[in-house]
Amino acid sequence: MLLFVYGLLRKREENHELLKGAPCVCEQAAINGVLYETDKGQPAASLAETAFVYGELYETDHQMIRKLDMYYADFDRKEVAVTTDAGNKTAFAYVVKPDQCASFSRIKSGDWKEYRFMKREDDSLVYYFAYGSCMDNARFKQAGVDHFFAEPVGGAVVEGYSTRFTLRRPDGSRADLVEDGGRTEGVLYKLPFEAATYLYKREGVDNHTYRPAFIEVCAGGRVYRGVLTFLVLDKAEEIAPPGHYQEEIERGADLYLSPAFSEKLKRYMNSLPKM
């Protein structure tokens, strides 16, 4: 029995303990709907075809569902279609009726974690995982933001994902992280929060090119949780990246990634069909 969660039941959120023992099937999942912050400061989603709500997918059982039904008694448990990188699935989700949301504040991104991330009021550092052209600093220098990225943590590993090239552009593809059970490498940066503004613009977040996501990263024998990265929204069949973009990736890979993975990534890019 699959359950889609989008708010306080997600990893590292205050009600996640209610899912103790439930295996996470997908960290990156979405349903058609609209996400809100209630007048009590809590997340609530209503079903709608006009937008997406992002969350996680878990394998649960009847006993856990009965417990959650009691906890979320003010919500309706509905069967929903869930989009994941592994294909479409059907799951339950706890949602509210649209007419209950009149006084709520809509969350434009559809992602509770991202909403909380952007609302932060402190100036704590941000950890960011780059797997494509942001492994290289050439465009950082051009934009005058290279000082933000001057002290990377270093090469890093992400389990459960693969680097793919699913974003199509007129001159070729751009990189993406796909949750397919693989293993990939990239660069982990420690940044001031203001660097997020540059990254959001570069990744085309407002244009719905990439979306922010938060993943677990291993670097230097340490696990970093809730690390910012960016995922392609409209994934297409893979084609080869253009030469100038591949050069950026290769420069970063040669500098930070393991030689074996760097070579594997180069071979993979060269194996993709050209436009």
Model-derived segments and spans:
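Glycine-aromatic micro-motifs
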Residues: 1-275
